[in-house]
From Swiss-Prot:
Keywords, ordered alphabetically: Acetylation, Cytoplasm, Proteasome, Virulence
Subunit structure: The 20S proteasome core is composed of 14 alpha and 14 beta subunits that assemble into four stacked heptameric rings, resulting in a barrel-shaped structure. The two inner rings, each composed of seven catalytic beta subunits, are sandwiched by two outer rings, each composed of seven alpha subunits. The catalytic chamber with the active sites is on the inside of the barrel. Has a gated structure, the ends of the cylinder being occluded by the N-termini of the alpha-subunits. Is capped by the proteasome-associated ATPase, ARC.
Protein name: Proteasome subunit alpha
Record's keyword annotation contains Cytoplasm: yes
CDD domains linked to this entry: proteasome_protease_HslV
Organism field: Mycobacterium tuberculosis (strain CDC 1551 / Oshkosh)
Family assignment from sequence similarity: Belongs to the peptidase T1A family.
HAMAP family in UniProt: Proteasome_A_B (MF_00289_B)
Pathways per UniProt: Protein degradation; proteasomal Pup-dependent pathway
Task performed by this protein: Component of the proteasome core, a large protease complex with broad specificity involved in protein degradation.
Gene: prcA
InterPro entries on file: Ntn_hydrolases_N (IPR029055), Proteasome_alpha (IPR050115), Proteasome_alpha-type (IPR023332), Proteasome_asu_bac (IPR022296), Proteasome_sua/b (IPR001353)
Keyword Nucleus annotated: no
Alphabetical list of Gene3D superfamilies matching this protein: Glutamine Phosphoribosylpyrophosphate, subunit 1, domain 1
Length: 248
């Protein structure tokens, strides 16, 4: 007589967690950090069409690591939720904390009820409305729906420990955009060097996706930094002059 295969709930949760963590660890790293002008997002991403960083609403941005199709579904769902709420009530009623809570509930439900968890980690960031003085808000949402409020920076995907350690040593509050980008890129290089046997990789315009939530913009804070504008900022890291211009 054969007995049905039984797995305890605790073991099932452990296996789901391990699956999700391994999937996220295979992804390229993403860093989000607060700087003097708002929030800077920097991702290792050689693709120009599959974006890991996005605008969610006027003052709210999004970054993710993991499986693209899974976090892109979440991104589009977040945009739809924000648009609907902003239209039904008021644009100021859409907040980063609110969207982070929605994502946490969604991921928690998927983790406990579906056969396979999402292999994703998310960051939702918000800057103050134009004319207000309030520090940026950064929220990390993990595959199981856990949510954490991070005061300075968020690291996701890849080998996070060396990147987080580098940021702990080099992060400076109220840094300029040029300095913040230098800190973020150096931290990403530290993570890549850890996985490549100590060789410091070259992270340039072609391999980086960069965007900011600019608190000094009147309505829509999100802007991408690409092409010559990004190149100028990367060059300024060696001979700092100005924060340059952005495009996109």
């Amino acid at each position: 007589m054969s007995f049905p295969y039984f797995i305890s709930p605790e073991q099932a949760m452990r296996e789901r967690s391990e699956l999700a963590r391994k999937g996220i660890a295979r992804a390229k790293s993403v860093v989000a950090l607060a700087y003097a002008g708002g929030v800077l997002f920097v991702a290792e991403n050689p693709s120009r069409s599959l974006q890991k960083i996005s605008e969610l609403y006027d003052r709210v941005g999004f970054a993710a690591a993991g499986k693209f199709n899974e976090f892109d579904n979440l991104r589009r769902g977040g945009i739809q939720f924000a648009d609907t709420r902003g239209y039904a009530y008021d644009r100021r009623d859409v907040t980063g904390r609110q969207l982070a809570n929605v994502y946490a509930q969604t991921l928690g439900t998927i983790f406990t009820e579906q056969a396979k968890p999402y292999e994703v980690e998310l960051c939702v960031a918000e800057v103050a409305h134009y004319g207000e003085t309030k520090p940026p808000e950064l929220y990390r949402i993990t595959y199981d729906g856990s949510i954490a409020d991070e005061p300075h920076f968020v690291v996701m995907g890849g080998t996070t420990e060396p990147i987080a350690n580098a940021l702990k040593e080099s992060y400076a509050e109220n840094a300029s955009l040029t300095d913040a980008l230098r800190i973020a890129v150096a931290a990403l290089r530290a993570g890549s060097a850890d996985t490549s046997g100590g060789d410091q990789p070259t992270l340039g315009v072609a391999s980086l996706e960069v965007a900011v939530l600019d608190a000094n913009r009147p309505r829509r804070a999100f802007r991408r930094i690409t092409g010559s504008a990004l190149q100028a900022l990367l060059v300024d890291q060696e001979s700092p002059q100005s924060d340059g211009e952005s495009s996109g």
